Every structure is written in structure tokens, then in C-alpha cells.
């Protein structure tokens, strides 16, 4: 439905709102795999199982796994010598891997395979002598892990302005990689700025932003013109969830991110005829459905899934956790 058609229909109270569900939404294959790794490790070895950082950036998921015996730590020093530790889906630096080995820890790596792909790119290109621009958010665990695949020669940029300030050693030996959960549109702008300033820059064979990030952003682009407010299910520290909220706002639709049903405020629905709902790649469908239940309790009259891509991606578990 076009925005013109939307404008022609008189808005009614929130009690008559229709909820449109973006497709796809919620868990991606990398998140599914990471959570299953923790659950399988708990089943096989028993609690406690230590996890370095949040396995994925979702408070609901972390709380659930903690209740089952997972212990989330910030540093490997918090893991007993000889204990079992799981690396989060965001990946870790080479230094963290070496520290785990030095402490004699049993390690299961829940790094998303699409993040590992970027790690391999970095290691290969540094070996070939390329200086590498990393497009990403400073301080994000994925960025720290990816930049930590090399001892030096990594340059972080977060914006087009950062590109203008870059000082590189040899423009002819320059490459770039990206964080997997960025805004597709903003990343394209940064890449364009890099290419304009460094025409010889070496590109990844395939874009580093993952399929799930792309698909969920495309789903919001499809949904936004049909609704008057967007609710994103996701935790504040979830990069991909934040990008969904920002995207809806850039498309001119008020957007809110929630972590629990109680955070949905009745006034968001006031006078709204259609409410859009999506969920970040680290948000479980059961949490999204609890938000739908909250919207129904506030008077939403119907829920309608939108058309969209059906994802069927899956990744194998690490050796030692696979079912024989």
C-alpha cells in the first residue's frame, strides 16, 4: 500500500490498530548456532559453562542461558584453569585465543561463520601486505575481534568524515572489510568515499554485511511505508537492532526499540491505524510474540505477517558438540 493511500484513510484509535509483522525478523543462523552451542555444552559437560561476553546481544537470551547454568564473564581470568569457555558469536582476537590456550581452557567457538569469513580475509590480506580499513563501530566486540586478527596495519572508520582523515602508508596496497551488522545504506556511502579517495582499494569478493542484516533491513524498507509506527524487538547493545530502528526513522516513521513487553507504551498506538513490528537477529521469536500479545492487550485488533524472504540458512556445530 502506498503512503498516499495511507494518508487518505482516517486514522482511528490505537484500539483498532492492525499489527504488521516484518519478514524475515528475529534469529539468524549464526545466533541459532551460538545459542545451541551453549545449550549443547551444558548438556554434555554440565554447569558451569563459561561464556566470554554475552553470547549474543540480547538480554532475554542471556538471562535464559544464565538460568540453565551459563556463566557470562568479561575476561578469561574469570574462568577457572581447565574450565570450559565459549567465545561469543561476535568473535575474538588472536590474543584471546592464545590466552585461552595458555590457561588450558576447553574452548568452543560460537563465532558466527560469516564473521569468521571476515577474520580469514583480514589474515590473508595482511599476509599479502595490505593495510586494511575496517568499517565498523568502535568498541563493538565484533570490531575488536576482527581488528585483533592482525598485530598492526588496521584502520577503523565509522563515517564518511573518517575516510577523509585517513592516513595510509601506500594507497596501492589498501583493502577494506566491514562489520557484518552495519546499515547497508550507510556502509555503501562509506565504501563510495573510500573508493573515491583510494581508487585502487582492494574489495572483498563478497560484501561482509551478512545476509540476515541485509534481509531484515530490506524487510523494514518494505514495511515502513505501510505503517505509522515501528516497534523493533531488541536489546540496546544490539547493533543490528539499532540499525533497524534508525532505518525506520530515516524512512520517516517513528520507531521504538523494546526489550520487554512492559516497555511498549500505550501512547505509541494512539491514533495509529497500522503498527509495524520487527525483531533484530539476536531477538527470539517468543519475545517478539510476547510484544504482539502486549499490543493485543492494548487493543490491537489483528496481526498480519507481511510477505518476505524465507531464510533456510544453517551452520554446523563445532566438533565435540555434534550429535553422532
UniProtKB/Swiss-Prot annotation:
Q: Which organism is it from?
A: Ralstonia nicotianae (strain ATCC BAA-1114 / GMI1000)
Cofactor remark from the record: Binds 1 [4Fe-4S] cluster per subunit.
Q: What is this protein called?
A: 4-hydroxy-3-methylbut-2-enyl diphosphate reductase
Entry's EC annotation: 1.17.7.4
**Gene3D superfamilies for the chain:** 3.40.50.11270, 4-hydroxy-3-methylbut-2-enyl diphosphate reductase, catalytic domain (3.40.1010.20)
**Keyword Oxidoreductase attached:** yes
Q: By which gene is this protein encoded?
A: ispH
* Alphabetical list of NCBIfam families matching this protein: ispH_lytB, PRK01045.1-2, PRK01045.1-4
The record's function comment reads: Catalyzes the conversion of 1-hydroxy-2-methyl-2-(E)-butenyl 4-diphosphate (HMBPP) into a mixture of isopentenyl diphosphate (IPP) and dimethylallyl diphosphate (DMAPP). Acts in the terminal step of the DOXP/MEP pathway for isoprenoid precursor biosynthesis.
What are this entry's molecular-function GO terms? 4 iron, 4 sulfur cluster binding; 4-hydroxy-3-methylbut-2-enyl diphosphate reductase activity; metal ion binding
Keywords in alphabetical order, please. Answer: 4Fe-4S, Iron, Iron-sulfur, Isoprene biosynthesis, Metal-binding, Oxidoreductase
Query: What family does the entry list?
Result: Belongs to the IspH family.
* Binding of (2E)-4-hydroxy-3-methylbut-2-enyl diphosphate, residues: 57, 90, 140, 180, 238-240, 282
Catalysed reaction(s)? isopentenyl diphosphate + 2 oxidized [2Fe-2S]-[ferredoxin] + H2O = (2E)-4-hydroxy-3-methylbut-2-enyl diphosphate + 2 reduced [2Fe-2S]-[ferredoxin] + 2 H(+); dimethylallyl diphosphate + 2 oxidized [2Fe-2S]-[ferredoxin] + H2O = (2E)-4-hydroxy-3-methylbut-2-enyl diphosphate + 2 reduced [2Fe-2S]-[ferredoxin] + 2 H(+)
Q: Where does dimethylallyl diphosphate bind?
A: 57, 90, 140, 238-240, 282
Named cofactor requirement(s): [4Fe-4S] cluster
* Pathway(s) annotated for this protein in UniProt: Isoprenoid biosynthesis; dimethylallyl diphosphate biosynthesis; dimethylallyl diphosphate from (2E)-4-hydroxy-3-methylbutenyl diphosphate: step 1/1; Isoprenoid biosynthesis; isopentenyl diphosphate biosynthesis via DXP pathway; isopentenyl diphosphate from 1-deoxy-D-xylulose 5-phosphate: step 6/6
Any one GO BP annotation for this protein? isopentenyl diphosphate biosynthetic process, methylerythritol 4-phosphate pathway
Q: Name the domain of life this protein comes from.
A: Bacteria
Summarize where [4Fe-4S] cluster binds, as residue positions.
28, 112, 210
* Active-site residues from the entry: 142
Amino acid at each position: 500500500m502506498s503512503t498516499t493511500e495511507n494518508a487518505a484513510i482516517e486514522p482511528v484509535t490505537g484500539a483498532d490498530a492492525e499489527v504488521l509483522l516484518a519478514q524475515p525478523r528475529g534469529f539468524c543462523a549464526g545466533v541459532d548456532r551460538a545459542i545451541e552451542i551453549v545449550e549443547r555444552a551444558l548438556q554434555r559437560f554440565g554447569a558451569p559453562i563459561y561464556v566470554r561476553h554475552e553470547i549474543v546481544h540480547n538480554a532475554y537470551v542471556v538471562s535464559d542461558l544464565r538460568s540453565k547454568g551459563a556463566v557470562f564473564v568479561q575476561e578469561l581470568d574469570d574462568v577457572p584453569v581447565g574450565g570450559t569457555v565459549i567465545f561469543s558469536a561476535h568473535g575474538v582476537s588472536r590474543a584471546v585465543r592464545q590466552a585461552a590456550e595458555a590457561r588450558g581452557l576447553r574452548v568452543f567457538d560460537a563465532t558466527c561463520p560469516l564473521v569468521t569469513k571476515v577474520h580469514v580475509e583480514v589474515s590473508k590480506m595482511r599476509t599479502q601486505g595490505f593495510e586494511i580499513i575496517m568499517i565498523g563501530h568502535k568498541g563493538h566486540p565484533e570490531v575488536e575481534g576482527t581488528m585483533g586478527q592482525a598485530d598492526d596495519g588496521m584502520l577503523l572508520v565509522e563515517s564518511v568524515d573518517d575516510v577523509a582523515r585517513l592516513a595510509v602508508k601506500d594507497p596501492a596496497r589498501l583493502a577494506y572489510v566491514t562489520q557484518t551488522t552495519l546499515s547497508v545504506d550507510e556502509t555503501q556511502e562509506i565504501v563510495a568515499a573510500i573508493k573515491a579517495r583510494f581508487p585502487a582499494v582492494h574489495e572483498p569478493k563478497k560484501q561482509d554485511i551478512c545476509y540476515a542484516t541485509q534481509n531484515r533491513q530490506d524487510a523494514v524498507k518494505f514495511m515502513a511505508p505501510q505503517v505509522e509506527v515501528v516497534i523493533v524487538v531488541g536489546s540496546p547493545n544490539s547493533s543490528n537492532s539499532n540499525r533497524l530502528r534508525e532505518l525506520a526513522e530515516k524512512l520517516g516513521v517513528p520507531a521504538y526499540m523494546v526489550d520487554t513487553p512492559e516497555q511498549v507504551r500505550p501512547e505509541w498506538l494512539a491514533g495509529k491505524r497500522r503498527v509495524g513490528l520487527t525483531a533484530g537477529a539476536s531477538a527470539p521469536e517468543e519475545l517478539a510474540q510476547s510484544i504482539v500479545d502486549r499490543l493485543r492487550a492494548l487493543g490491537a485488533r489483528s496481526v498480519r505477517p507481511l510477505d518476505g524472504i524465507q531464510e533456510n540458512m544453517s551452520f554446523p556445530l563445532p566438533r565435540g558438540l555434534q550429535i553422532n
